[in-house]
UniProtKB/Swiss-Prot annotation:
BP-aspect Gene Ontology terms: rRNA base methylation
Keyword Membrane attached: no
Source organism (scientific name): Corynebacterium glutamicum (strain ATCC 13032 / DSM 20300 / JCM 1318 / BCRC 11384 / CCUG 27702 / LMG 3730 / NBRC 12168 / NCIMB 10025 / NRRL B-2784 / 534)
Residue stretches making up the TRAM domain: 6-64
Source superkingdom: Bacteria
Name of the protein described by the UniProt record: Uncharacterized RNA methyltransferase Cgl1903/cg2084
Source species taxonomy: Bacteria, Bacillati, Actinomycetota, Actinomycetes, Mycobacteriales
Binding positions for S-adenosyl-L-methionine per the UniProt entry: Q242, Y278, E300, D341
PROSITE patterns for the chain: SAM_MT_RNA_M5U (PS51687), TRAM (PS50926), TRMA_1 (PS01230)
Xref: InterPro entries: MeTrfase_TrmA_AS, NA-bd_OB-fold, SAM-dependent_MTases_sf, TRAM_dom, U5_MeTrfase_fam
């Protein structure tokens, strides 16, 4: 067994980055320890400054690239190059980005999910890979300048833009000659499907409150208009919507394909039923009703999002319920199909158990964090469901984030 050499915070060591890790880091080894390397790309040899130290592992940041990986490129994001926490994959060749992300997911599913045999991954790169973000949140410093937050810091990068964002969205908001805002507020800006830019000043919700406060509408109406297929949603700019301009259509198309040809068992003789959990404004409800001819019950915590869904989908057999998914499942009619899109923290054991007890034939589970998705996959297995399909969407190009959709079938 290799002896562990004494290290201290601030020490600089040489590490070869061997593989990617969840969270955008690279993994290497040094004298018996696993080293997590912020800014490391597989194939790099780097000097790493130790920031966190444990008995069996350490975490640090690249201070010098001594031998660059073949997949390392010049930074594609001015804001990230200036220290912003936006595009942590800005120096990774975009042609290998989705493959790196699929490796991270596979590792999480094997280690955390306990899945030995995985279905073949369906990999989808969403275009464009720059200028794809149609909504953004900016901090405002003490002098009123808006900018992008540095990683785990309140400091802002105010001089340059992030390459994720649609360029016209940031015009006059960030950089030289940009307007000034109220110090300490947050700027929310979006360009909607009608081509209208909306800019508001807001203040985050205080602890225990669900909604933030929009202090002032600076441009537009403050109510965005988003269109997918034949349906148009109108809701406050502060409400959730998919960041990538092509994501709503891409996810909807995958769900439509997963539901195509599904033979539903009508046990109660009252017609097919589907649940749309963490449903937001009901983005997926039209696809579900169209493919299954089912009554859809959507559960969403935000009253504003549910109201927007009711208005947009009036005439469809969709019922919106406002509340937490944890307390709502037992009150809904038994479903044939469940679609759920939980937050980054995942759905969790209690929610998945309550869904499984309702015995849906098919579950479509959307995840935006590979670790919590893998944890939920393990719970599906415990509750008698197995993964039938798996898709990975590079819906956040230039970052370590990605979207995963798993299709699960009941086997017991």
């Amino acid at each position: 067994m290799t002896d562990t050499v004494e290290l201290a915070k601030g020490d600089i060591i040489s590490v070869e980055v061997l593989r990617p890790a969840h969270g955008g880091e690279g993994i290497g080894h040094h004298d018996g320890r696993v080293i997590f390397v912020k800014g490391g790309i597989p194939g790099d040899v780097v000097d790493v400054e130790i920031a966190q130290l444990k008995k069996k592992w350490a975490r640090g940041e690249v201070v010098k690239v001594t031998t660059a990986s073949a997949d390392r490129v010049d930074s594609r994001c001015p804001a990230a190059a200036a220290g912003a926490g936006c595009c942590d994959y800005a120096e990774l060749n975009p042609t290998v980005e989705l493959e790196i992300k699929s490796r991270v997911l596979r590792d999480q599913l094997e280690r955390i999910g306990g899945i030995d045999e995985l279905p073949e991954f369906e990999l989808q790169d969403l275009e464009p890979t720059a200028g794809w973000r149609t909504r953004v949140r900016l901090g405002v410093d003490a002098s009123g300048r808006a900018g992008f937050r540095k990683l785990k810091s309140n400091e802002l990068v105010t001089e340059v833009a992030c390459s994720q964002v649609v360029p016209e969205l940031l015009e006059g908001l960030v950089g030289e000659g940009a307007r000034r805002f109220t110090p300490g507020v947050e700027i929310i800006a979006a360009i909607d499907d009608a081509g209208q830019r909306h800019v508001v000043e807001s203040r985050k919700a205080p602890r225990g409150r669900r909604t933030e406060t929009v202090l002032k509408v600076l441009e537009g109406t403050g109510e965005v208009e988003q269109k997918v297929g034949d349906y148009t949603w109108k809701f406050p700019v502060s409400s959730f919507w998919q960041a990538h301009t092509k994501a709503p259509a891409a996810y909807s198309e995958f769900i439509a394909e997963a539901l195509t040809g599904l033979e539903l068992v009508d046990v109660d003789k009252r017609g097919p039923v589907a649940w749309d959990l963490y449903g937001g404004v009901g983005l997926f409800a039209p696809i579900i009703t169209s493919k299954l001819q089912a009554a859809v019950h959507s559960v969403e915590l935000s009253p504003g999002s549910a109201e927007a869904g009711e208005e947009a989908l009036a005439g469809l057999p969709v019922t919106f319920h406002t509340g937490r998914v944890e307390g709502m499942a037992s009150q809904l009619p038994s479903p044939n199909v469940v679609v759920l899109d939980p937050p980054r923290t995942g759905a969790g054991s209690d929610v998945l158990k309550s869904i499984a007890e309702a015995k849906p034939q098919l579950v479509i589970h959307i995840g935006c964090d590979p670790a919590t998705f893998a944890r939920d996959v393990a719970d599906w297995k415990l509750n008698g469901y197995e993964m039938d399909q798996l898709a990975v969407f590079n819906a956040f190009p230039g970052t370590h984030h990605f979207e995963t959709i798993g299709v699960f079938v009941r086997v017991s």
